[in-house]
Amino acid sequence: MSPSVLEPQSVPTLVNVGLKAVGRNDAPVERDARGLSKPLLELMPTLGTDAFTFSPIRESTVSRAMTRRYFADLDAHAETDIVIVGAGSCGLSAAYVLSTLRPDLRITIVEAGVAPGGGAWLGGQLFSAMVMRKPADVFLDEVGVPYEDEGDYVVVKHAALFTSTVLSKVLQRPNVKLFNATTVEDLITRKHHAESSSSSDDGEAEDEAKVRIAGVVTNWTLVSMHHDDQSCMDPNTINAPVIISTTGHDGPFGAFSVKRLVSMKQMERLNGMRGLDMQSAEDAIVNNTREIVPGLIVGGMELSEIDGANRMGPTFGAMALSGVKAAHEAIRVFDLRKAQNDKC
């Protein structure tokens, strides 16, 4: 097995997200020789008989159980530490690393689709297998996804195995909340002031026109899709000192943040994703994952629209490791951005 990508020097205190801790039964489950638990085996013969019935419930109980928790999450994450825009392979990988290394941080994932995972449920041309070039196998080892080792690359038997594994691990973290079927409609901005009149501690030049990203503007995806035929559907907001945008290459919701930077005059133009070149594309995406403007880190294929990088097609190693790099960058700049964000 390859060494872990995660080497935390200390384990910070777990963040309190506003709800009571999730109850878990960590006691070992008794199983028979066939592998099923004793309670399930005892239940099976009753299914379809008069002896089987669910516990009683009233419809309003279900409504309140969902509503209470969702609005508690909205309240808890209105002010968060890190927002990840887009829950594809890059965004989920970033969420995994962040929530592991910094359990003290509140991490909010905003995904436009009902189903998280982006394009990582299948390989190329709707085929099942997922190919990752080494050293991305290190991340597969980290999350426990099995694969076939083919020398310079590895093959996961079904892309959904990777996505569902990372997704399940991320969603179990108490400091992570996923808001799916929710889109980011805009970015919250503040005028960016460098630390001195010439440059800041991290080398940022003073520029009166420069902005710092201080959160995201959200709405239900279905509402966002109908702004042209309905009126007065104002959004909601989430404040955060660091945003990681991993919305993919240009498309209906793709490359959203970087396109918005152009319209806000923070970038002159996008260079546009180039044609497919697996050899150069993956290195470029991982190595150039970075903070584009203060408070906004861009990773994955969204980055290709800024840099004019090649697309890599159906090989996914760069998506996973770009997420790892994005998490590393977020941790690196977090204290500075939080200090700036707390001033306003």
From Swiss-Prot:
One BP term from GO: thiazole biosynthetic process
Induction annotation: Repressed by thiamine, but not by thiazole. Induced by various stress conditions, including heat, cold or osmotic shock.
Cofactor note (record): Binds 1 Fe cation per subunit.
Keyword Cell membrane included in the entry's annotation: no
Family according to the record: Belongs to the THI4 family.
Oligomer status and interactors: Homooctamer. Interacts with cyp-41.
Name of the protein: Thiamine thiazole synthase
Organism: Neurospora crassa (strain ATCC 24698 / 74-OR23-1A / CBS 708.71 / DSM 1257 / FGSC 987)
